[in-house]
Regions:
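Hydrophobic, aromatic-enriched interface-forming segments
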Residues: 57-112
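Asp-box/WD-like beta-propeller blade repeats and closely related beta-sheet repeat scaffolds
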Residues: 1-6, 35-70
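Conserved beta-strand positions in repeat-built beta-propeller and related beta-rich domains
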Residues: 17-23, 75-80, 140-146, 189-194
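Conserved blade-ending motifs and adjacent loop-strand segments that build the rim/top face
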Residues: 113, 119-127, 160-184
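Loop/turn-rich, solvent-exposed surfaces of beta-rich toroidal or solenoidal domains
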Residues: 111-160
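Beta-strand initiation motifs
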Residues: 36-53, 93-116, 158-167, 208
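Structural signature of eukaryotic scaffold interfaces centered on beta-propeller domains
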Residues: 4-15, 58-75, 123-134, 178-189, ...
């Protein structure tokens, strides 16, 4: 599992927590229901919680971060320098991901069953660690190592390019900013502090803006 701290999203309509993952070959989106989480106890057998749903994501190299917005799951792939993508997956009324047959996958790798289908894709710049929506705006966090972080703000467009040059506003942040989450009039910011280089200065709290 090589996701960042931004690799979780919560579906508020269906009360499902989504978690990024990596299978033996493909990126994955995995889901756990809120009721399952509330009834889980590690002390009951000392086993990790099992996913209620798991989907291979065939069109994205790795699922690094994700967010939920307006009945859809947005999944992005972190790269250090090269351009990358965010893909949009619709969520059905029962909380499952929208699936359909993909003739290209059937022809190239022999996948014949319906698969989680990305209905749109947007290009992003490198170093993107997290994503949020706020007042019809898209917010992307960018950070790498000890360099200052930033939040880039874009006007929301289904097919818009979300590269650095297209941002209409950029806000500087301290280093190691990863995921952000919008709730009401507040933005919650999560900073990396679990890796060896950052562990000597752990950050155990969320920052509310």
């Amino acid at each position: 599992h090589q996701s960042t701290c931004g690799g979780m999203a919560y579906d508020t309509m269906n009360q499902i927590l989504w978690v990024t993952g990596q299978g033996s070959t493909w990126a994955q989106a995995n889901a756990i229901t809120l009721s399952h989480l509330e009834n889980y106890s590690f002390e009951d057998g000392y086993h990790p919680i099992e996913f209620d749903m798991s989907y291979n994501l065939y069109k994205i190299k790795r699922a690094s971060f994700m967010t939920y917005h307006d009945g859809a799951l947005f999944v992005g792939f972190f790269t250090q320098d090269n351009a990358s993508v965010i893909e949009k997956y619709l969520i059905n009324a029962d909380g499952t991901l929208y699936e359909k047959e993909d003739m290209n996958l059937k022809r190239t790798v022999g996948v014949t069953d319906p698969v989680a289908y990305a209905v749109s894709m947007q290009v992003i710049s490198g170093k993107v660690q997290g994503m949020a929506f706020y007042n019809n705006k898209i917010l992307l966090t960018r950070s790498w190592g000890i360099l200052p972080s930033e939040v880039q703000i874009f006007n929301y467009s289904r097919y818009g390019i979300l590269s650095t040059s297209e941002a209409y506003k950029t806000i500087k942040f301290p280093e190691r900013l990863e995921q952000i989450y919008q709730d009401g009039g507040s933005i919650y910011a999560l900073f990396e502090s679990g890796l060896m280089p950052t562990g000597c200065h752990p950050l155990t709290e969320l920052t509310v803006l």
